[in-house]
Amino acid sequence: VSLTDEEKHLIQHIWSNVNVVEITAKALERVFYVYPWTTRLFTSFNHNFKASDKGVHDHAVNVSKALSAAIGDLHNVNKNFSALSTKHQKKLGVDTSNFMLLGQAFLVELAAFEKDKFTPQYHKAALKLFEVVTEALSCQYH
């Protein structure tokens, strides 16, 4: 998957207009609720999976930092996510399908936040972003 210059611009525009940590925490809460098996790696959260809970918020900070770095350097997402991919594969044992589930949850949260501004063009650009991120996070699995 590759992003056009217009899509890169749209992604950076979207990301600059949202509270990144809040959107990320809401996306994580949605994943944990809709796909409960994804909570198995987060036993330290003690079954507290709301966006406002400390464990979710702290993880949202880490995820949002990684996504912000990716969005800031869209030409090198695979390279920049290589170590994170290795960590998710070897240390954490994350199923790669979970990355796309989180991407889908982000799309819902972005659409809810942006409302009428979340045009089909924004949707396509954001979807492609999360496909790129999913590919990058999955690269060490192959």
Swiss-Prot record:
Expression (tissue specificity): Red blood cells.
Residues the record lists as binding heme b: H59, H88
Entry's Gene Ontology cellular component terms: blood microparticle; haptoglobin-hemoglobin complex; hemoglobin complex
Domain Globin: 2-142
GO molecular function terms listed in the Swiss-Prot or TrEMBL record: haptoglobin binding; heme binding; metal ion binding; organic acid binding; oxygen binding; oxygen carrier activity; peroxidase activity
Biological process terms in GO annotation: hydrogen peroxide catabolic process
Superkingdom assignment: Eukaryota
Keywords tagged on the record: Heme, Iron, Metal-binding, Oxygen transport, Transport
UniProt xrefs under InterPro entries: Globin, Globin-like_sf, Globin/Proto, Hemoglobin_oxygen_transport
Cited SUPFAM superfamilies: Globin-like
Entry similarity comment: Belongs to the globin family.
Subunit structure: Heterotetramer of two alpha chains and two beta chains.
The protein's role, per its UniProt record: Involved in oxygen transport from the lung to the various peripheral tissues.
Name of the featured protein: Hemoglobin subunit beta-2
Higher taxonomy: Eukaryota, Metazoa, Chordata, Craniata, Vertebrata
